[in-house]
């Protein structure tokens, strides 16, 4: 059985996390040449490349498996050894979450964990359709995802749903939809997407108004909070979680353009198994507040 030296795995992990050899060397307090040597040693052990040397570097499939192994071992070491090794370094937890969860319920959910445990979060923001891939690649130890099936050797729990409403300011609605929300008006109304892969707005219009994907002009803005600001100032119409704009809907700053219609995204919490004590506390905190704040109609 091939047993890697964990110093070599930590070098591989550092190159991925720091997005390059130079910063990885600084992080590990060794030379860049030493980082390269450790990774080469690991690649020689397994007889195959473990890094795709692009900018930034990314792990191969075998590299992903080794990173996942490293992260699981680190969590289990924390569980069984605790701080017996005399280090005051907080445990690093890398989590992949969608921007809308981060802007609404996730940080309040993690508050008691951060207050109680010596951990350091590395939150990586990604669309909920793609966060599970980061877990698969070993880049994170937990992910909020819409995928209902767990990866091999992973655990999953249903959190609840975010309901997205199609909203705009009253002034925007008067200007762009004087005769109501129609197909012809939608083709001219400015909208916004999180990135070029964000298809929620287009999917909603296709499902409810039979508009083909790509037919509506969209700004690209990588910020959940900016969606709210753009809508409130009358610049765009957009899909925003009801949870995020409850107050704006109540005070009239925003209006629901299509009452009775919404785009629902059921969210799941994925993480590696077995679960360490620290990850169990993270899981319990996310499930507790997530199930209080997210829609639960479809929870079995």
UniProtKB/Swiss-Prot annotation:
GO terms for molecular function: DNA binding; DNA-binding transcription factor activity. Signal peptide: none annotated. It comes from the Bacteria. InterPro entries: ArgP, ArgP_gammaproteobact, LTTR, LysR_subst-bd, Tscrpt_reg_HTH_LysR, WH-like_DNA-bd_sf, WH_DNA-bd_sf. Keywords: DNA-binding, Transcription, Transcription regulation. Residues 4-60 form the HTH lysR-type domain. SUPFAM superfamilies: Periplasmic binding protein-like II, Winged helix' DNA-binding domain. PROSITE patterns: HTH_LYSR. The keyword DNA-binding applies. Pfam families: HTH_1, LysR_substrate. Residues 21-40 bind DNA. NCBIfam families: argP, PRK03635.1, PRK13348.1. PANTHER family: HTH-TYPE TRANSCRIPTIONAL REGULATOR ARGP (PTHR30579:SF2), TRANSCRIPTIONAL REGULATOR (PTHR30579). Homodimer. Controls the transcription of genes involved in arginine and lysine metabolism. Belongs to the LysR transcriptional regulatory family. This is HTH-type transcriptional regulator ArgP. The gene is argP.
């Amino acid at each position: 059985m091939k047993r890697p030296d964990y110093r070599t795995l930590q070098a591989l992990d550092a190159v991925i996390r720091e997005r390059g050899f130079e910063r990885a060397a600084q992080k590990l307090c060794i030379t860049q040449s030493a980082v390269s040597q450790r990774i080469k040693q690991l690649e020689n052990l397994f007889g195959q490349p473990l890094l795709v040397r692009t900018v930034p570097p990314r792990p191969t499939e075998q590299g992903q498996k080794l990173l996942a192994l490293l992260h699981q071992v680190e969590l289990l070491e924390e569980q069984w050894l605790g701080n017996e090794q005399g280090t005051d370094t907080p445990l690093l937890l890398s989590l992949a979450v969608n921007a809308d969860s981060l802007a609404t319920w996730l940080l309040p959910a993690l508050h008691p964990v951060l207050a109680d445990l010596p951990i350091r979060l590395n939150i990586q923001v990604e669309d909920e359709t793609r966060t599970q891939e980061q877990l698969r690649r070993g880049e994170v130890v937990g992910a909020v995802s819409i995928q209902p099936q767990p990866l091999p050797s992973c655990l999953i729990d249903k959190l609840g749903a975010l309901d997205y409403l199609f909203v705009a300011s009253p002034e925007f609605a008067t200007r762009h939809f004087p005769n109501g929300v129609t197909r012809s008006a939608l083709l001219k109304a400015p909208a916004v997407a999180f990135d070029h892969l964000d298809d929620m707005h287009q999917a909603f219009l296709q499902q409810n108004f039979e508009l083909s994907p790509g037919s509506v002009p969209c700004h690209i803005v990588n910020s959940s909070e900016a969606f709210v600001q753009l809508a409130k100032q009358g610049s765009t119409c957009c899909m925003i979680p009801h949870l995020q704009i409850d107050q704006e809907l109540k005070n009239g700053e925003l209006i629901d353009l299509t009452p009775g219609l919404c785009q629902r995204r059921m969210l799941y919490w994925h993480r590696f198994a077995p679960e360490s004590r620290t990850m169990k506390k993270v899981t319990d905190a996310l499930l507790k507040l997530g199930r209080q704040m997210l829609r639960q109609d479809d929870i079995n």
